[in-house]
Amino acid sequence: MDMNTILLVYLGISFTHLSFRSEGYQFLGDLTKVLLMPTLMLFLMQQGNYPLLLAALLFATIADALLNKGHQGSHFFWGMASFAVCHIFYGIHVLSLGVDWILTAIAFAGLMIPYSLLYRLIGKQKGAAKYLAYAMLLFMLASLLTGLASLLCIMGIVLFIISDTMIGLDSLEIRHISNTSEMGSYILAQLLLVLGFTAL
């Protein structure tokens, strides 16, 4: 199976998943969700040697399976922990490529503005520390990707932040956002990140 075919399969699974979610077919939606990242892993293996990216997508798959259980409780905690490991592997891969540290520092300083707003919004809520720690990790990865100067990767991490913000708002019961919106952002985020990394 060539790489273009694999990408078409990914897009097909994505469309099918979003359709199942929008129609309320929970089991089929859960099933197609856990097929997404393994499909991108096949694409990566066709592209070359990317062990860190494969590890990242493996933990993303674990996170997807755990978050099928919802945005509360121990499954949610371990799901987000798995995503944190995913981001760490992404970050290590970025560092192995080399970044512009000036761009990285500028991006990090800029991202501290929304981070401070997040702290003011949820800082006093019970269990806020884990959300704030996760957000810091995500913003650090976003800063590194800015230093990498890959437009695809930057677009990908922005969509990842949007998706995770939706999940966080739902988990904290601040605002419920449709699962299709959250997953649509996430599906495109992971695709853009993988395409960005393999284009470097």
Over which residues does each language-model region extend?
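Polytopic alpha-helical membrane-helix bundles and their juxtamembrane interface segments
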Residues: 1-200
